[in-house]
Each structure stands twice: as structure tokens, then as C-alpha cells.
């Protein structure tokens, strides 16, 4: 009789991994006045149904030696399965005794592109259902024939836990009782053609194994969401849209994996708690306002530096448990330091366990390689025109802002998103619906992203920054005015022009003077960050110090002068780790900055200069309040190419003023007249040639007096001694 309790067609479909609805046959089913319980437990020797208290309700007979069991019970309440395995016994609730888990309305919102629905529905969530603790798994895979969740809890056997398809929305769900946070898992998917795919990590995993292992990990979401934050005052004080452009931003860019290692433990990377002990005091002591991390969401290949992530919701396990990052941010905020994370929505790697061909189809990426493959990085390009993909990515950004309290999101590779022909030759790209090269889906996505991060869905005060290297108009213009809606944009043109100028021998700089002045032609067309980032100190480009010509003294002097120019120039500041003490070697992701250079006075001097520049920049409103407003800048000397001298005034709207004078030759210049906007004594606020910074200590004895001699469009002026390869800042005494 037992063979009639389990239809042969169901058995064959389940064992073949192609059953369209496992809940239709597995679990309890009322039939002809009785309850039939069916279970698929490959490898089990004996199965019984028992009450929660352990009383036996009935045996489930083996109806197929591959692991199909069935039996009848008269009990109509909760039951459990008592399973005898070859080497163990187990008592567990039946995963197929629970009803649907996800709300239809929430799934409909997900299909419509609502990021909040991604956060509410997808991933692995420890929950209690009908008094039973377990984990709800949910994954989007609309084109799969079958999806199972696999892990240590079922010996990674995809036959054990096939999931329920919520067909209209393409989401598969299953509640697995008796497991919880810390459980390792993946998904086993059978493609529409019946082929078995490699096990896939959860796209919405909140935690992962440390590479090179690739499993997802069930995170304690209740603990994460209930983390004991102490930064309410910091969050409340974050500047709103009207003020955030008027405050100082000096950003220290960090590769968390290599900033400082632990040599006693095989040079492993520091954990978040260790970084909190070391990095936060360092950033604070150096006067930086923010730390920006290169991508920290989980990434399989260390050589990508994080720019090929595969777990957009999970801090990398390289740095310890995910709540360690929350503790880091909390401690940074307590120290007055903001935290920015790099975030990568442009592309993803094609690792077998990742998003590529996730359900056997081009689900997250474009199917056409002219749209779906990035030629520079051999990575997959997100299909941002698909509601679910857009919602997935925006939900990730919101999760970093909401769950981890980050202060800013820097969006990587925006230019590659905006142009359909980016790095593609003729015939290798697909025009938009109007025949143009603009990627209209990316434009819509970026606007939606910025509106979400600046709206009610995110905590107040979250800032967005674009790495955008072209002249696309309105990157920082409001979305309502047709812009992309970013708060800031990296000024890549300024960086390339000024570094190219400084690479020239000083005797030739006169022929390239425009490279130092051209940036002011467009400096206020967008709100800019001046980035001396990791991209400029890798792949044979040399470190900042190594880019400068001549001997070591002149190289460091030129770098100091450049820093003085940069910190006085309109725009927020960003400096990559190691550059603050003039490291000679390039960035090496598998190494660490050469901290031993700080044993040398010359390198300590550069580090001290950066500290003092940061402090002066932050304390002097004239240097930051109108960073994004043309009213805050006046050229005094922009055309002295023969002497390679520049001079300009920075001011705030109250009338405070700082004048910067730069001499980019090794020739000291005495009696050099510079126009000044006010009479009286002017003190040297900064001299990058000071002895404490490793310079020759030339200058003006700390102060000059303005004379009633008009010059450079100003009613007063002073004659100065310009130190070699140096920048001076003057402020009214």
C-alpha cells in the first residue's frame, strides 16, 4: 500500500531534480480523511513522524531506495521527523510542512523594481515560523527549472531541499527549520534545459566565507539590524544638501587589505577591530575628515582590489565578521571621521559561483556580448534596464547606508556605464533606441540611485560621489534639472593635467603652463573632488614622488609644492595611502605601504606637511566654504609661464581670504611682487619649503606687509621671496 502514497512520477521527478512544485507532494497532505506525510531524504535508513515532545506518530516507509519515504498519521498538528542516518540520528521539523513565506505584494514590488522589496524578501533570513526557528531562503531565478538550497545541513545534496517557486515573480523560497546564523550555504540550480549549473553563492548574502572559499553564510540579521550604535549625534549632525558642499572634505583613500598587515601571522590583513585601533587614530591625527575604502563587499580575486565584487551586500570576510565593520564605522564616527565606501554597479566577474548565467540564462547581465561583456576587464555588464537588477543594486547601496551607517558611496566606473561605445570599436556596440551612444538605462539607474540615497529610503546626509572621467554634462546637477544627481564628481582632468605638468623637467614647464590653469576654466561646472587616487600609483605609472623629475630632494620638494597647490585649489581633496609620506614605490595590493620610510626625516616632513595642510584647510573657511562656487576664487597671477609661478586668492562669503603662491621651478625668486586684496600685515599660513617639512627654509620670516602699490588687479601688493619648488599661503594677520 505504501507505494500508492507516493506517485511514481513525483518520485522520478524529485530524484531527477526536475519537479516543478515539490510542495505539491512533499510534506503533509490531507487525503481521504488521513494525513499523508512524504519526505525526500537520500541516505536515510529510517524515518518516523513524532510529536514535538517526541511521541511517535507513525513510521514513514521507504518507497524508493534512493530516499523517498511516505506514511500516514492521524495527528493534524505540528509534527517532526526523526531520522536515522548511517552515523547519526536527527530530529527536525519538516521544511515542507510550512506554507508560503513571502507576501505577494512585496514580491510584486520587487518585480516592479522596488529596492526595499529586495531587502525585505531576498537572501537568507533567520526567522521564526509557527514557533519554529530556522532560516528563510529566497532567491530570484525565474528561468531555472529547479532551485535547491544546499549546505552542511543537508550534506550539500541538492535533492534534499528543493525550493518553492513563486511563479509570477520568479522567486524561489524555502524555510529550513533548525538552522541559524553561521550556516554555510549555496544554491543548486537546474537550468531550463535540464542541465545542472555550478553551485551558486547567494546574490543577496549578508555574509560569506573568506576567499578562496566561496560559500555564502547565514548572517545574524537581527543582531546586525539591532546593532548597538552610538553615533546618533553624528548622523543627526551630518550636513544636509545645503551645507555639505561648504564643509571641508579631505579623504584618505585606503585599500583595507593592505594598509597594515599582521606579520606575526603570515602577513594576514588586519581585521576591522584591528583597523579601528590603528587606522582611525592615524586618520584623525593626520587631519583627514573621511576615510574612503576601496571596495569591501566580498570579492573572489584579491588582484581586483575589490573592483570585481560578487556579494554586494556583504563586507568581505577577509576582515573578520561582518559586525566588525559596523563597529569600525561606529568608532570612526565617535572620532569625528566619516566613512565612504567604493561601490561597483557597472560590472561583475564571470566566476562560476557568481551572477553570470545565474539561472542558466543572462539574468543579471545582457545576453548580447556587445552590451553584456566589458572589453577592458572581461567582466559582465549589469542589465540596468531590468527592474529586478536595478532594484538589486540600489538595495545594496541602501544596505550600506542603512545597516552600516556609511556616510558616502563612491560609484566606480560611471563613464563606462554612460556610454554604450565605451572602449568598444565600431560594430562592437549597440546604439540606444534613438541611434545614439548614450546608455539611457544607465542614466535612469543613476538618477534613481541618487534619488534613493538622498531620499527617505536612506538615513539623512548620505553623500554620493561619481568616478566619471568624461565631460558628461550635469553629473552633479539635480535629477529634477536633468542631471545625474551626484553630490560630487572626481576631477580626473585636473589630476591628469597637473601630474603631466609636474612630470616635465622644470626648465620645460613654461611650455606646459596651461595644464596648471586649464582646470579653472571648468572648476565650477560641477562639484569636484580632486583625486590623487590609487589609479595614479599603479600599473607602471609610478608613485606620486617617483613621477617628479630630478634628484630625491627636488622630487620631494615638488611633491610638497603640489600638495600646497592642491589643498589651496577649489575642490574637495582625496589622497591615496602611502602618498602622504611620499612613498617611492607603486601601490602593491599584496604588500603594504612602506612605513619604514618614516624613519627618514624627509618623508616624515612630507607626512607632517599633509597633516598641517589638512588642519589649515579644515580650520580656514576661505579654503573650503566656496570650494564649489566661482565666488570663492580669484586669479592673481595665472600667466607667468616664464617663471612657472601661479598665484590666486581663495575666500569665503564673509570676506576671509587666503592667497596661495606657487613656484614650480628650483630657482628662488626674490622681490617677486604679488597683488593682495587687503592692506596690512599678511602672515605665512603655510610654507611647503619650511625646514620641518624637509625644505630649505627659505621664505619671508613668517610675514609680509602689503604696500599701497596696485598689482594683478588688486589695490595692494607685496614683494615676496619665493622659495624653490614651493607653495606659500598668506592670510591677513
Curated annotation (Swiss-Prot):
One GO CC annotation: cytosol
Name of protein: 1,4-alpha-glucan branching enzyme GlgB
Gene: glgB
PANTHER family: 1,4-ALPHA-GLUCAN-BRANCHING ENZYME (PTHR43651:SF3)
One GO biological process term: glycogen biosynthetic process
Function text: Catalyzes the formation of the alpha-1,6-glucosidic linkages in glycogen by scission of a 1,4-alpha-linked oligosaccharide from growing alpha-1,4-glucan chains and the subsequent attachment of the oligosaccharide to the alpha-1,6 position.
Family statement: Belongs to the glycosyl hydrolase 13 family. GlgB subfamily.
Active site: 412, 467
Annotated source species: Burkholderia vietnamiensis (strain G4 / LMG 22486) (Burkholderia cepacia (strain R1808))
Amino acid at each position: 500500500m505504501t507505494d500508492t502514497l507516493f506517485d511514481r512520477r513525483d518520485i522520478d521527478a524529485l530524484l531527477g531534480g526536475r519537479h516543478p512544485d515539490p510542495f505539491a507532494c512533499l510534506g503533509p497532505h490531507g487525503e481521504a480523511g488521513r494525513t499523508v506525510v512524504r519526505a525526500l531524504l537520500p541516505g536515510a535508513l529510517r524515518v518516523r513522524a513524532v510529536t514535538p515532545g517526541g511521541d511517535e506518530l507513525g513510521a514513514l516507509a521507504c518507497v524508493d531506495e534512493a530516499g523517498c519515504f511516505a506514511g500516514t498519521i492521524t495527528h493534524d498538528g505540528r509534527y517532526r521527523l526523526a531520522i536515522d542516518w548511517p552515523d547519526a540520528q536527527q530530529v527536525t521539523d519538516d521544511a515542507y510542512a510550512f506554507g508560503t513565506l513571502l507576501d505577494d505584494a512585496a514580491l510584486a514590488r520587487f518585480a516592479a523594481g522596488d529596492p526595499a522589496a529586495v531587502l525585505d524578501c531576498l537572501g537568507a533570513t533567520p526567522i521564526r515560523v509557527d514557533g519554529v526557528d530556522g532560516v528563510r531562503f529566497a532567491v530570484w531565478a525565474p528561468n531555472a527549472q529547479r532551485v535547491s538550497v544546499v549546505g552542511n545541513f543537508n550534506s550539500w545534496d541538492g535533492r534534499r531541499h528543493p525550493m518553492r517557486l513563486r511563479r509570477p515573480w520568479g522567486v524561489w523560497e524555502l524555510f529550513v527549520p533548525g538552522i541559524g546564523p553561521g550556516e554555510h550555504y549555496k544554491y543548486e540550480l537546474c537550468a531550463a534545459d535540464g542541465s545542472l549549473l555550478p553551485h551558486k553563492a547567494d546574490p543577496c548574502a549578508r555574509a560569506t566565507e573568506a576567499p578562496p572559499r566561496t560559500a555564502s553564510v547565514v548572517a545574524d540579521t537581527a543582531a546586525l539590524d539591532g546593532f548597538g550604535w552610538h553615533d546618533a549625534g553624528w548622523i543627526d549632525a551630518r550636513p544636509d544638501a545645503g551645507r555639505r558642499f561648504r564643509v571641508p572634505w579631505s579623504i584618505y583613500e585606503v585599500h583595507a587589505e593592505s594598509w597594515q598587515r599582521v606579520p606575526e601571522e603570515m602577513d594576514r590583513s588586519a581585521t576591522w577591530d584591528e583597523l579601528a585601533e590603528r587606522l582611525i587614530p592615524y586618520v584623525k591625527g593626520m587631519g583627514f575628515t573621511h576615510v574612503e575604502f576601496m571596495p569591501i563587499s566580498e570579492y573572489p580575486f584579491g588582484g581586483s582590489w575589490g573592483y570585481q565584487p560578487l556579494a554586494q551586500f556583504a563586507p568581505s570576510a577577509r576582515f573578520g565578521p561582518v559586525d566588525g565593520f559596523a563597529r569600525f564605522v561606529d568608532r570612526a564616527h565617535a572620532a569625528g571621521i566619516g566613512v565612504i565606501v567604493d561601490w561597483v554597479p557597472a560590472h561583475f566577474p564571470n566566476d562560476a559561483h557568481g551572477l553570470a548565467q545565474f539561472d542558466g540564462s543572462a539574468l543579471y547581465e545582457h545576453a548580447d556580448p556587445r552590451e553584456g561583456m566589458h572589453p577592458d576587464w572581461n567582466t559582465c555588464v549589469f542589465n540596468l534596464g531590468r527592474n529586478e537588477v536595478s532594484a538589486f543594486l540600489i538595495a545594496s547601496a541602501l544596505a550600506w547606508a542603512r545597516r552600516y551607517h556609511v556616510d558616502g558611496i563612491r560609484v566606480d566606473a560611471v563613464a563606462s556605464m554612460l556610454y554604450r561605445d565605451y572602449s568598444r570599436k565600431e560594430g562592437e556596440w549597440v546604439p540606444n533606441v534613438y541611434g545614439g551612444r548614450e546608455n539611457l538605462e544607465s542614466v535612469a539607474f543613476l538618477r534613481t540611485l541618487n534619488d534613493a540615497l538622498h531620499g527617505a529610503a536612506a538615513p539623512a546626509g548620505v553623500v554620493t560621489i561619481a568616478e566619471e572621467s568624461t565631460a558628461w554634462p550635469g553629473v552633479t546637477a539635480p535629477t529634477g534639472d536633468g542631471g545625474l544627481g551626484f553630490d560630487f564628481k572626481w576631477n580626473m582632468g585636473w589630476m591628469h593635467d597637473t601630474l603631466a605638468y609636474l612630470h616635465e623637467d622644470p626648465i620645460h614647464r613654461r611650455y606646459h603652463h596651461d595644464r596648471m590653469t586649464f582646470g579653472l576654466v571648468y572648476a565650477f561646472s560641477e562639484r569636484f573632488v580632486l583625486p590623487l587616487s590609487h589609479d595614479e600609483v599603479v600599473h607602471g605609472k609610478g608613485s606620486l614622488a617617483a613621477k617628479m623629475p630630478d634628484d630625491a630632494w627636488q622630487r620631494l620638494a615638488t611633491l610638497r609644492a603640489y600638495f600646497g597647490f592642491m589643498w589651496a585649489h577649489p575642490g574637495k581633496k582625496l589622497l591615496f595611502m602611502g602618498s602622504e609620506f611620499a612613498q617611492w614605490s607603486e601601490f602593491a595590493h599584496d604588500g603594504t605601504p612602506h612605513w619604514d620610510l618614516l624613519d627618514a626625516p624627509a618623508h616624515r616632513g612630507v607626512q607632517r606637511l599633509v597633516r598641517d595642510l589638512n588642519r589649515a584647510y579644515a580650520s580656514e573657511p576661505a579654503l573650503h566654504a566656496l570650494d564649489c562656487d566661482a565666488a570663492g576664487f580669484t586669479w592673481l597671477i595665472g600667466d607667468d609661464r616664464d617663471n612657472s609661478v601661479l598665484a590666486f586668492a581663495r575666500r569665503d562669503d564673509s570676506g576671509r581670504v587666503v592667497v596661495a603662491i606657487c613656484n614650480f621651478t628650483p630657482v628662488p625668486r626674490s622681490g617677486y611682487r604679488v597683488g593682495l586684496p587687503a592692506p596690512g600685515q599678511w602672515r605665512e599660513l603655510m610654507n611647503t619649503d619650511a625646514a620641518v617639512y624637509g625644505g630649505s627654509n627659505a621664505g619671508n620670516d613668517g610675514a609680509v606687509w602689503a604696500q599701497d602699490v596696485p598689482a594683478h588687479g588688486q589695490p595692494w601688493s607685496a614683494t615676496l621671496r619665493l622659495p624653490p619648488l614651493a607653495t606659500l599661503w598668506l592670510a591677513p594677520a
